[in-house]
Amino acid sequence: MRLPLSLAAAGILLAIPAQAHVTLDPASAPAGSFVRAALRVPHGCNGAATTRIAVEIPEGIYTAKPMPKPGWRLTIERRPPQAAHAAHAAHGHHEEEEVARIIWEGGRLPDDQYDEFVLMLQVPNEPGGTLFLPVTQGCEGGRSDAWAERPAPGQQAHDLAHPAPAMRLNPR
């Protein structure tokens, strides 16, 4: 009797799809460094193809540049610089505005395929901290998923339904 019950339980577990989230690669980087970061998109929205990825760039990130993606239209939205930007500009950086959001849209990533959306950025010089890059994933039919939740102290990101892609900042 135990064997059929175990097999039935295993069958139920196999029928439940694994929940995959938009993630950031690498998962960690030296604080203050320049990083090639890839937003990994493992699926669409309940079977619908992904047609838009928008990533929010936190204030204080002075360098953020997207990699163009063939077949996708690229938009860079900007915001006025923070006061801290003046000190950053004194070190040879001449951007007049900070990048606020990077959007790839107009392409089509089927639900059963995987892809990466790449950007280069200088991560904050905050050893021991975590950089969160909230992402909104738009799909055919108007559905969207906001991957923007941050874990509370003591909580793990994998416990959240829609965790924001994150990168740990290590000492140099």
Q: Residue spans of the language-model regions?
A:
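Bacterial N-terminal signal peptides that target proteins for export
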Residues: 1-7
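Extracytoplasmic/periplasmic copper-protein system
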Residues: 31, 138-172
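A surface/secretory-pathway sequence property marking extracellular, secreted
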Residues: 61-98, 165-171
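Low-complexity, intrinsically disordered segments enriched in Ser/Thr together with acidic residues
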Residues: 102-129
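Short, surface-exposed ligand- or partner-binding patches at beta-edge/loop junctions that are enriched
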Residues: 127-137
